[in-house]
């Protein structure tokens, strides 16, 4: 066990790291916010690929095409790199180019470019601070057709994919290779159907143009690979390109030794005069593999576009990497080498079944060697690859970049291209704010509401403050899986000083009837950062006590707005704890937002009357209404460990068959010492004492016999709980069946009144 002093030092270091990270985030937000006040520079383009891992993928293809076009000669190009000096091939090529420059990710120059560049092109995501400005055009190209489950299709995927979803909602254009990618990934996996207001350009992936070019001029492609350190000669190229593992580019799992072993073992089994096995790893693990591989002549460098290599590859070996979708257009064979397919399919999930993949599956090195030899022996194009290309690569024809540029940069008529803007549905869209996800009665009611909504009628988005805390994470995991989730990172597009000024002003003065320009700008920027272009028919602040969501909702561009009143709000504001009114300032500010809501929703008729009277000076009577909190009956039974059939059997006087294996103990009912001995054979002394004390306390508070049925309710004795109705109803039950009792656990201002009613 750790000593107290060691634990203290560990906690101290964690606090220092947390504080340092917070200060860095504040500095970034401050700089980015400052640059957002500057004009957007016309005819500028910012490119970022894989968080700055190089000049790569679709952004690289778009960049080179634009650079080659006479009608785009006035464009200024800005490339984002993780470390500018770490990419000498790229920077050296454009050192003297007057229209190309490089910025380091996270730097002040990067934040300036992100805030003031007209065209933003990324194949992954911009950071949490980013929010697209109205003058900007954001093109997210993504980086491949999905094979692995993505977004909400992964276990716990909604919170994990929070920044991807946010980026997509901010985008003006998303790039798609084919209908499968559009429907499977954009519409369903990231749940853009219903709220996305941009366009999906389904005209192929720009990066595949490099593949077509490489196939037309293989000598140039092979020469490029040779110049970057690969030893090819005139041998046929076998490319091993496995996927990366992990949940984010920032935290990949790397097993470099295993990857290198596969290449060396396969090369050893083939004729070295005729075949060469080369390795292409994902950009995010490249440095780690280079460190382990040392000076080798078979690792494809990041500086060579992947599709350039694919164009001269004779046989592709991969696992779950979507790289094979690009390769299908070559008509050459694909092999899948996977040692954990069943486990991976269960844990992560795949969109295609094993039998739907486009090549043989090998689970061992001997099997891979055999399949490799068979594929290399064939002189005919791969029928499976050609069939797959018709579905997944029909538009990877060498002109995908031109078509995208025509739509985005040249303003071509979209009717001549496959451009989807049909993301609306007949469902009404609901945005429900859940608050900070801390366990309490309001949280339980919110989760119950999400489970009881009609998802055939409503498209539901649950919005909350993201947290990794154990209690809050548990509640996040209980959000109905049918709801889309948008977790908010706790930051603003403003400096900490500007945030304090805005919040302090609102806390002191509240919201006026007419909202000022500065208020609207501040909160509209935050709305854009979180939700992008999304619009909702109905906005619900179910939390009811915080200031953030009411202030944010005033800047919402559309939708009716409702806020829940979970208690006698005026009394809550005056409630004292240890001599202080902790809620007074906050609720006074919240009350001033009521004039900007359409509905003020109490949770019972009686509470509605109380709030309508107490808050009359803040809103008109027509805004006050009520909606009784819902119950998730299935969850109650599940947590109680019983089924509806068991409940029905007990009500009918039958003894239900639990279907459980229960060990039964026998004892002498007339001898307590003997009975206790038998009991202690099955339970610890502490458990027996705890149960005895609990029953003794219950017997004192609510006497009853062994045959008495006990009902228990737990909650604050306040109007919204409506204990009076429960007591009156239970009186009728007791009149018909005296052998029942009701135990009410709680305290509050209605205690004396309820005691009188009892």
Where are these regions (language model features)?
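N-terminal pre-catalytic "stem/leader" segment of glycosyltransferase-like enzymes
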Residues: 2-113, 423-518, 522
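Short N-terminal targeting/anchoring amphipathic segment
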Residues: 46-47, 112-126, 508-520, 527-546
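Conserved catalytic-core segment of nucleotide-activated headgroup transferases in glycan assembly
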Residues: 56-64, 68, 76, 205-289, ...
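Membrane-proximal helix-turn-helix segments that form the acceptor-binding/catalytic region
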Residues: 109-111, 159-174, 527-534, 569, ...
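Active-site proximal beta-strand in glycosyltransferases
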Residues: 133-150, 335, 538-540, 553-573, ...
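Catalytic binding pocket for nucleotide-activated donors in carbohydrate/polymer assembly enzymes
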Residues: 163, 288-296, 322-392
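A short, active-site helix/loop in glycosyltransferases that binds the activated sugar's phosphate group
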Residues: 173-197, 587, 593-626, 631-680, ...
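C-terminal amphipathic helix plus adjacent low-complexity
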Residues: 365-440
């Amino acid at each position: 066990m750790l000593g107290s002093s060691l634990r203290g030092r560990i906690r101290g270091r964690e606090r220092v790291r947390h504080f340092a990270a917070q200060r860095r985030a504040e500095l970034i937000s401050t700089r980015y916010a400052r640059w957002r006040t500057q004009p957007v520079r016309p005819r500028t383009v910012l490119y970022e690929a894989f968080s700055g891992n190089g000049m790569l993928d679709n952004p690289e293809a778009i960049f080179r095409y634009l650079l080659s076009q006479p009608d785009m000669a006035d464009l200024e190009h800005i490339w984002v790199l993780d470390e500018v000096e770490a990419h000498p091939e790229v920077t050296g090529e454009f050192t003297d180019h007057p229209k190309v420059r490089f910025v380091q990710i996270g730097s002040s120059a990067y934040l300036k470019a992100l805030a003031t560049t007209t065209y933003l092109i990324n194949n992954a995501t911009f950071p949490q601070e980013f929010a697209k400005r109205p003058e900007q055009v954001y093109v997210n190209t993504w980086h491949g057709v999905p094979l692995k489950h993505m977004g909400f299709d992964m276990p716990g995927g909604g919170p994990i994919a929070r920044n991807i979803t946010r980026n997509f909602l901010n985008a003006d254009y998303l790039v798609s290779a084919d209908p499968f990618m559009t429907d499977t990934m954009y519409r369903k996996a990231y749940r853009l159907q219903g709220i996305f207001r941009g366009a999906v350009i389904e005209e192929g992936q720009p990066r595949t143009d490099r593949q077509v070019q490489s196939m037309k001029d293989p000598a140039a492609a092979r020469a490029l690979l040779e110049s970057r350190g690969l030893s090819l000669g005139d041998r046929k190229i076998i490319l091993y390109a496995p996927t990366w593992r992990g949940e984010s580019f920032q935290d990949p799992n790397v097993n470099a030794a295993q990857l290198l072993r596969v290449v060396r073992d396969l090369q050893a089994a083939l004729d070295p005069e005729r075949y060469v096995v080369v390795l292409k790893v994902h950009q995010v693990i490249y440095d780690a593999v280079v460190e382990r591989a040392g000076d080798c002549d078979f690792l494809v460098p990041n500086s060579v576009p992947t599709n350039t290599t694919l164009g001269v590859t004779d046989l592709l070996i991969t696992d779950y990497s979507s790289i094979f979708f690009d390769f299908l257009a070559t008509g050459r064979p694909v092999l899948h080498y996977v040692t954990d397919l069943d486990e991976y399919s269960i844990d992560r999930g795949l969109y295609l079944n094993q039998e739907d993949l486009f090549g043989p599956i090998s689970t061992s090195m001997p099997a891979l060697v055999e399949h490799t030899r068979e594929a290399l022996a064939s002189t005919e194009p791969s029928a499976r690859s050609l069939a797959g290309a018709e579905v997944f690569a029909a538009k990877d024809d060498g002109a995908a970049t031109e078509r995208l540029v025509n739509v985005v940069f040249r303003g071509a008529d979209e009717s001549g291209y496959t451009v989807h803007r049909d993301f609306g549905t007949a469902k009404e869209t609901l945005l429900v704010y859940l608050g900070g996800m801390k366990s309490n009665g309001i949280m339980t009611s919110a989760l119950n509401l999400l489970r009881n909504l009609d998802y055939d009628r409503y498209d539901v988005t649950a919005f909350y403050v993201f947290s990794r805390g154990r209690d809050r994470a548990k509640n996040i995991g209980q959000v109905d899986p049918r709801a889309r989730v948008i977790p908010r990172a706790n930051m603003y597009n403003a400096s900490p000083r500007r945030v304090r000024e805005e919040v302090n002003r609102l806390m002191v003065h509240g919201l006026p009837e007419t909202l000022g320009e500065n208020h609207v700008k501040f909160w509209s920027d935050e709305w854009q950062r979180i939700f992008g272009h999304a619009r909702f028919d109905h906005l619900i602040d179910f939390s009811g006590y915080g200031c953030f969501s009411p202030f944010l909702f005033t800047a919402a561009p559309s939708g009716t707005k409702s806020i829940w009143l979970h208690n006698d709000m005026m009394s809550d504001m005056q409630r004292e704890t240890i001599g202080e009114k902790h809620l007074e300032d906050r609720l006074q500010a919240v009350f001033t937002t009521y004039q900007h809501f359409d509905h003020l929703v109490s949770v019972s008729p009686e509470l509605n009357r109380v709030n309508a009277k107490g808050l009359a000076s803040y809103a008109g009577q027509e805004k006050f209404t009520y909606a009784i909190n819902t119950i998730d009956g299935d969850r109650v039974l599940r947590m109680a460990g019983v089924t509806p059939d068991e409940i029905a059997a007990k009500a009918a006087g039958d003894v239900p068959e639990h279907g459980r294996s229960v060990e039964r103990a026998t004892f002498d009912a007339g001898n307590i010492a003997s009975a206790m001995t038998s009991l202690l054979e099955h339970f610890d002394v502490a458990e027996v004492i705890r149960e005895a004390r609990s029953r003794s306390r219950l017997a004192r508070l609510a006497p009853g016999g062994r045959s008495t049925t006990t009902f228990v309710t737990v909650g604050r004795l306040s109007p919204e709980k409506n204990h009076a109705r429960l007591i009156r109803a239970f009186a009728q039950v007791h009149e018909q069946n005296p052998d029942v009792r009701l135990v009410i656990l709680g305290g509050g201002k209605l205690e004396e009144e309820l005691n009188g009613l009892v």
